[in-house]
């Protein structure tokens, strides 16, 4: 049952792949030929039937999905729909190959993937090259002694796996600059802590033995090796691995399975660590062996892990990290980045290295990674893996199957898709760690293989050839059937007459420019008509009412973006019935004379409010200056408007009967209070006004009394301030005089000269004073 499962999954994946290709849509843009059509998308097809498009219809209607073209009446034989194709080529010479087919030719249509199957069958006894790369720092002394004894055992273990095995040897320590090694001359000669111990000077990498099938030679060359030493714990192992991968001729790699055993008891330096030793140049990934020594290690930084992973994959080398127990987790993290690599726990003295290599090889050879060489961005490759153990994965960036047994095939479905028309190119698919490859030749599928109809004389008016259903006109002729003669005018000059307002779009993108005039397309939308000098108009792009253009055919019609309403209707979408009954006030005046009626509703002038435009809340009080002046001239024949009252106050009618409105009380031109009442009538600035008969005039103030009182007050305040100042100065002088009198009474005078000094000096004998 499990044996059938991969094939069943493969069939289902193929059906899904075909189904997804059929269900695609066609999104076209500026399509004028079959080539343009098939590049528009994988779902687009082209109809080459003659006269498939009618008058005014663009050639772009020939481009659509196959289903739509069939519905439009295009015969199936006239539909051009080139598909992406994969043509595998199998080796017929009977050579033993682990990958098949050996070559595949793809014809790729943009956006449509081509799929093909790659089968891997693991062969028994495939040749192996094994290179043993050993850390010779002082802590590996016991390991070196054991490896010297295991040369024959290593080659014998290879012969148990394969009929053709070879083995080589190399060693490494670290860069020979501080802080990686002690640069004292004595320490450079003998870096070991025990001076009596024979040690060789430190080095970055030494290629000791080229790959060979002679176990005695291996044992002899390894037996000559001496231990060395360095300062810090991490070693320069990545430098050594890079040289092993970058120097295939010096190492002696064959085009077979390549294994690299990396034996160490510590970590590793990587890119950036070289700066500690003033080494700033990045590692270039090239071979720099001179006399089997990496002599330029102090010029280049350590490689990065990613750089090393790429180089190992490029060189098809599978590393086996034989490390001590404390380093297993560190190198397991490294194998997550480096494909087709394994980790084995090395005993403290490397006595188990033979079994470790055998176990790691079986683990590596039973897992297959299918990958490809570097591709441009326009190509995308995905893998569907169908493994013999029942596991599967879909749409991954590389194929992956584990537990692959000898002679038990596993199948990968490879899908290749181009995002655009590409140039012819090729790439290689290979199983990592194995030598077999699949060469994939990619060719573009961007042309239509239409029937040749150019021999028919009646087509294209004899002035062109028919290609895929459309005319390709001779020089000097243009048009759908080459009916227009340019008469020396360029197509740019003719098209200039078809561009509105010097636009870059010909005929608004909705027509063809034929002999300098726009011939509008027939729209795909039912009942839609495109018209106008530049095909800029139609009969559907107008405002809608009740979800219908211009309210429906019974209300109006659309004409180039504006509704033309039928009698009895109005509005931008013919949404209104033509009537004014809803706009009449109680006096049957439309909008009170302060607005206009639209859609049977008042549109009021600024400052007035619906429904009848009677109120003006933003106008403020009616008691304004011009109304007060009108009341003054109409009632009392005076004021600013006295001479032209009939003109300035034409909208006001003086009433003798009081009005029931809020009165206004304002000052007139003479300062008297005048009281009047206003009643607004229909229209703007039309009022009835009633003015009270009497004026309230208030007597003015006594100016002389105010001025005289002010002057007297100022004088009195000045006199008072002078009196206060005089009193203060008198009190100050009196206080000073009394203080002077008091000081004079205290002073006492004598007749001694204070500068006189006596000439007599008396000295007392202290002994005499005691007696």
UniProtKB/Swiss-Prot annotation:
Topological domains (Extracellular): residue ranges?
Answer: 24-702
Q: Which InterPro entries match?
A: Integrin_b-2_sf, Integrin_beta_N, Integrin_bsu, Integrin_bsu_cyt_dom, Integrin_bsu_tail, Integrin_bsu_tail_dom_sf, Integrin_bsu_VWA, Integrin_dom_sf
Q: What is this protein called?
A: Integrin beta-2
User: What is any one of the record's Gene Ontology cellular component terms?
Assistant: integrin alphaX-beta2 complex
Post-translational changes noted in the entry: Both Ser-747 and Ser-758 become phosphorylated when T-cells are exposed to phorbol esters. Phosphorylation on Thr-760 (but not on Ser-758) allows interaction with 14-3-3 proteins.
Q: Which residues form a coiled coil?
A: none
User: Which superkingdom is the protein from?
Assistant: Eukaryota
**Using the chain's own numbering, where are the disulfide bonds?**
26-44, 34-448, 37-63, 47-74, 192-199, 247-287, 387-401, 421-446, 450-468, 460-471, 473-482, 484-515, 498-513, 507-518, 520-535, 537-560, 542-558, 550-563, 565-574, 576-599, 583-597, 591-602, 604-613, 616-619, 623-664, 630-649, 633-645, 672-697
Residues that, per the record, bind Mg(2+): 137, 139, 235
Query: Which residues are reported to carry the modification Phosphoserine?
Result: 747, 758
Residues covered by the I-EGF domain: 450-483, 484-536, 537-575, 576-614
Post-translational modification Pyrrolidone carboxylic acid, affected residues = 24
Q: Which residues bind Ca(2+) 2?
A: 174, 230, 232, 234-235
| Phosphothreonine sites (modified residues) | 760, 762
Task: Give the UniProt subcellular location, in the record's own words.
Answer: Cell membrane; Membrane raft
Q: Which organism is it from?
A: Mus musculus
Q: Which BP terms from GO are recorded?
A: activated T cell proliferation; amyloid-beta clearance; cell adhesion; cell-cell adhesion; cell-matrix adhesion; cellular extravasation; cellular response to low-density lipoprotein particle stimulus; integrin-mediated signaling pathway
Its domain description in UniProt is:
The VWFA domain (or beta I domain) contains three cation-binding sites: the ligand-associated metal ion-binding site (LIMBS or SyMBS), the metal ion-dependent adhesion site (MIDAS), and the adjacent MIDAS site (ADMIDAS). This domain is also part of the ligand-binding site.
Q: Which residues cross the membrane?
A: 703-725
Write out the GO MF terms: amyloid-beta binding; complement component C3b binding; metal ion binding
The UniProt entry, under Pfam families, shows:
EGF_integrin, Integrin_b_cyt, Integrin_B_tail, Integrin_beta, PSI_integrin
